């Protein structure tokens, strides 16, 4: 029986042997496609290749693409765990031709793979074609020998694929496997096609047309192929099971869940184990690709998935966070194929554990509210939207979690009411969020790239260079010239200007030629390797084809280099101090400062922050060379280079190494090794020093550090030194003794505060005074001490009441404190022998009402309350005395 890993390898090896480039899976967060929340098909990373905007070095490719469908229109979340084939995360095997082979070869490749390599019986296979696609039907007859009754013509859009309203499109041909007549269902196109007997395992898309308008469709000059085979589906077929959750991969994950919970995946618990297994995959891969749980966008979809799994863990009786304990099983099954799981192990584990720990605090309370709200509901009823929204807003229950919790009882949720409540609160969950907020792909730069090629970057070695203007863009359109006063984007054949990326800001400077000059205010990377210099023509007229001299602002670049190199050192110092789970989540490398966002679940202590700074400065003081090497990405990572989770790297990467580790597991090796395309100092000593100026949380599990280097750090320390001198002067001491002087003053203040409190206590207990009230008196035979005091804080009233109880021996005590704002605090106390007759809670509530308050609380022997009307203190004492009967 072939396992999932073997099936994946067989597929990729087969197409590699047939001339296809094996391309790694792209991240789950799509690059350069703001229309998608997550990568949901193998063709996503090739979209610009299919449309002609991008060109690759190969025209045949094959992939095993990780996919997520759990947001927007591609949302399988509700069904996951309850059906045989729904998943949030899945792998799509595919082969692609970019204008190379077409229908005949695509069908031949597919048929040979499934019947010869995979060994599926031919009599169990049938196909569909688009009803007008005679070519595909004839090829199936010729290559596979299929009869007409096993080539089903479908006239619906199910067998015609389109990228959008316009653009490439074409007919599809789907391959189905027949599980046998013991399972209900009919062939595709029949009335019973929704049954489970005939299962689609592969879809071949023949891109042969371009849709110009709804009425006009023309032939593509270079027809292409896009195919997709669900790995989990074909694994079920090859392993002789009818349910995806019975394949070896899921059996291993479910077995781990059973062992961790002590509950078998049977009966009512079967769906819960399946939900956990599926959602563990989706959550782990999303975190590995840089998504963290949050309340919006992709992060909110991740949170929905995680919390749905956590609710099912609770159904299985898990008393402690479960998901993170299952991660080793997932890594065993999928880590070899997807090494990002191994690299992100610590981050995934910490994120899963932290999110489940947080959610468990409200899960039980929320489920209790849900139980109370649905107690009178029966199958077919609906839970009102207001309650569903309260569960979301107060207890963190995503709507689909509430729906899932009510599913087995047959109770629906008023989703319109939920949406209305959401609108009123202005807290949209963005379930239909359409993208990451990135600007849409600017096609003009792809056109320029095709025409003039990519820009050669010279900035690692020089800050001055000569070049030729290859393109000018003004107001979104390509122009041939730009005159004085024009704001223009300039493309040059080669440049020393760094284009903004990886958090490092783009360079500024000047581009000049014969009779003209352009002040460059920013440099960006566009399309595929086009450096765009954005600036204003300050003199003359610049034209395409002009020779130019390019000068980077070297002072600004030097400061940026220093801050970028310091960012690397701080990153490694954070990992050494806090743990290997620390990973970069964002950065800003500017000339005046650096900002670094990183994953860490809790606040950082002052001692830890000092250690991070000291470790970075140790490497700076080494004045060690900063080396760069070009390496294959896998080799670089194997040597320990840090890669950003979710970042897409080319075949060759730039590896930046700094310093020598003096302790720990890396002792004697390079201290910091990262994949980085930015600019850096030559020696670590060029940084001067680094000073951390702030650190704090910016999101759940993400913290932000800001720091200064070099001259900026020196000026900051100088400013701090001047402040210390000014403070010392005000204290009439020296800077070295300022702290000692401050501590002495604080001790003196505490001493005086204690003496003042003692004096006030004595005054309050000393009988008649300007504070009002009286000494101990008898009220209906009960000793009563009622006092009105000022200058005593509410927290000091209870100690006064304790002293008052000693003074009366047996009786009732009431102290009312009047604050500077005329508000009153009251404490009532009853000696132990009278607790059976009087309750301090009842007494203090009577006082509170008289003071304009709303009651109080405490114990029968001591209770506290307050009120806004301090001038009614005498009435409050009278109200308490009236209760002593």
From Swiss-Prot:
Chief location of this protein within or outside the cell: cytoplasm
Note describing how the cofactor binds: Binds 1 zinc ion per subunit.
EC nos: 6.1.1.7
Keyword Transport: no
Keywords from the UniProt entry: Aminoacyl-tRNA synthetase, ATP-binding, Cytoplasm, Ligase, Metal-binding, Nucleotide-binding, Protein biosynthesis, RNA-binding, tRNA-binding, Zinc
A single MF term (Gene Ontology): zinc ion binding
EC top class, as a word: ligase
Residues bound to Zn(2+): 564, 568, 676, 680
Subcellular location: Cytoplasm
Coiled coil: none
Family from the record: Belongs to the class-II aminoacyl-tRNA synthetase family.
Function: Catalyzes the attachment of alanine to tRNA(Ala) in a two-step reaction: alanine is first activated by ATP to form Ala-AMP and then transferred to the acceptor end of tRNA(Ala). Also edits incorrectly charged Ser-tRNA(Ala) and Gly-tRNA(Ala) via its editing domain.
Domain notes: Consists of three domains; the N-terminal catalytic domain, the editing domain and the C-terminal C-Ala domain. The editing domain removes incorrectly charged amino acids, while the C-Ala domain, along with tRNA(Ala), serves as a bridge to cooperatively bring together the editing and aminoacylation centers thus stimulating deacylation of misacylated tRNAs.
Protein name in UniProt: Alanine--tRNA ligase
Organism listed in the record: Brucella anthropi (strain ATCC 49188 / DSM 6882 / CCUG 24695 / JCM 21032 / LMG 3331 / NBRC 15819 / NCTC 12168 / Alc 37) (Ochrobactrum anthropi)
């Amino acid at each position: 029986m072939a396992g999932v890993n073997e099936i994946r390898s067989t597929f990729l090896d087969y197409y590699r042997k047939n001339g296809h480039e094996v391309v790694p899976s792209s991240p789950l967060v799509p690059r350069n496609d703001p229309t998608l929340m997550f990568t949901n098909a193998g063709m996503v990373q090739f979209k610009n290749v299919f449309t002609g905007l991008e060109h690759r070095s190969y025209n045949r490719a094959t992939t095993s693409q990780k996919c997520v469908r759990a947001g927007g229109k591609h949302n399988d979340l509700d069904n996951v765990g309850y059906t045989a084939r729904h998943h949030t995360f899945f792998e799509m095997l595919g082969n692609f031709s970019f204008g190379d082979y077409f229908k005949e070869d695509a069908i031949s490749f597919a048929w040979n793979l499934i019947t010869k390599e995979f060994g599926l019986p031919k009599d169990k296979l049938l196909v569909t074609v688009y009803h007008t696609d005679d070519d595909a039907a004839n090829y199936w007859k010729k290559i596979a020998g299929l009869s007409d009754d096993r080539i089903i013509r479908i006239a619906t859009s199910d067998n015609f694929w389109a990228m959008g309203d316009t653009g490439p499109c074409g007919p599809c041909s789907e391959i189905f496997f027949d599980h046998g007549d013991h399972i209900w269902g009919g062939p595709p196109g029949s009335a019973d096609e929704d049954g489970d007997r005939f299962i689609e395992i592969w879809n071949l898309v023949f891109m042969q047309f371009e849709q110009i308008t709804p009425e006009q469709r023309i032939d593509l000059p270079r027809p292409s192929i896009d195919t997709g085979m669900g790995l989990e589906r074909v694994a079920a077929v090859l392993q002789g099971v009818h349910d995806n959750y019975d394949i070896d991969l899921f059996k291993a994950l479910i077995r781990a869940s059973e062992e961790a919970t002590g509950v078998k995946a049977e009966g009512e618990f079967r769906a819960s184990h399946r939900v956990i297994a599926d959602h563990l995959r989706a959550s782990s891969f999303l975190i590995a690709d840089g998504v963290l749980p949050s309340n919006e966008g992709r992060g909110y979809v991740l949170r929905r998935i995680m919390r749905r799994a956590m609710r099912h863990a609770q159904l299985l009786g898990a008393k402690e966070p479960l998901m993170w304990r299952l991660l080793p099983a997932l890594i065993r099954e999928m880590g070899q194929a997807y090494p990002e799981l191994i690299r992100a192990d610590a981050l995934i584990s910490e994120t899963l554990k932290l999110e489940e720990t947080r959610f468990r605090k409200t899960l039980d309370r929320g489920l209790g509210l849900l139980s109370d709200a649905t107690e009178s509901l029966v199958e077919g009823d609906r839970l009102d939207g207001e309650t569903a929204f309260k569960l979301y807003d107060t207890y963190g229950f995503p709507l689909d979690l509430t729906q899932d919790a009510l599913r087995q009882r047959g109770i629906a949720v008023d989703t319109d009411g939920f949406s209305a409540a959401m609108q009123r609160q202005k807290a949209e969950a963005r379930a239909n969020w359409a993208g990451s907020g990135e600007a849409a792909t600017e096609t003009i730069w792809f056109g320029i790239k095709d025409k003039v090629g990519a820009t050669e970057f010279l900035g690692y070695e020089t800050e001055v260079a000569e070049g030729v203007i290859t393109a000018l863009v003004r107001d979104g359109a390509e122009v041939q010239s730009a005159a004085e006063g024009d704001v223009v984007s300039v493309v040059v054949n080669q440049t020393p200007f760094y284009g903004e990326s990886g958090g490092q800001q783009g360079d500024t400077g000047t581009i000049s030629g014969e009779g003209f000059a352009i002040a460059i205010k920013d440099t960006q990377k566009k399309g595929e390797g086009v450096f765009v210099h954005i600036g204003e023509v300050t003199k003359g007229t610049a034209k395409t084809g002009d020779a130019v001299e390019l000068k980077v602002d070297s002072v600004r670049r030097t400061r940026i280099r220093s801050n970028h190199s310091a960012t690397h050192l701080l990153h490694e110092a954070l990992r050494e101090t806090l743990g290997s789970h620390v990973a970069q989540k964002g950065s800003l490398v500017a000339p005046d400062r650096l900002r670094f966002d990183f994953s860490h679940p809790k606040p950082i202590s002052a001692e830890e922050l000092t250690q991070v700074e000291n470790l970075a400065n140790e490497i700076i003081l080494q004045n060690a060379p900063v080396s760069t090497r070009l390496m294959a990405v896998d080799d670089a990572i194997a040597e320990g280079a840090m890669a950003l989770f979710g970042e897409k790297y080319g075949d060759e990467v730039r590896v930046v190494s700094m310093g020598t580790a003096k302790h720990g597991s890396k002792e004697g090796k390079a201290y910091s090794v990262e994949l980085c395309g930015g600019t850096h100092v030559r020696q670590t000593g060029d940084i001067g020093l680094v000073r951390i100026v702030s650190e704090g949380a910016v999101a759940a599990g993400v913290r932000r550090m800001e720091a200064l280097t070099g001259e900026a750090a020196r000026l900051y320390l100088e400013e701090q030194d001047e402040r210390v001198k000014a403070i010392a002067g005000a204290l009439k001491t020296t800077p070295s003794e300022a702290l000692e002087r401050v501590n002495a003053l604080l001790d003196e203040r505490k001493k005086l505060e204690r003496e003042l409190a003692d004096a006030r206590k004595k005054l309050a207990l000393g009988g008649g005074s300007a504070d009002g009230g009286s000494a101990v008196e008898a009220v209906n035979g009960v000793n009563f001490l009622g006092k009105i005091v000022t200058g005593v804080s509410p927290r000091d009233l209870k100690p006064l009441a304790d002293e008052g109880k000693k003074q009366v021996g047996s009786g009732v005590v009431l102290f009312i404190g009047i604050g500077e704002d005329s508000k009153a605090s009251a404490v009532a106390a009853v000696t132990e022998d009278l607790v059976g007759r009087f309750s301090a809670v009842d007494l203090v509530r009577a006082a509170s009402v008289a003071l304009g308050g709303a009651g109080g609380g405490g114990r029968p022997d001591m209770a506290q309350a307050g009120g806004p009307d301090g001038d009614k203190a005498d009435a409050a004492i009278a109200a308490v005395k009236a209760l002593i009967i």
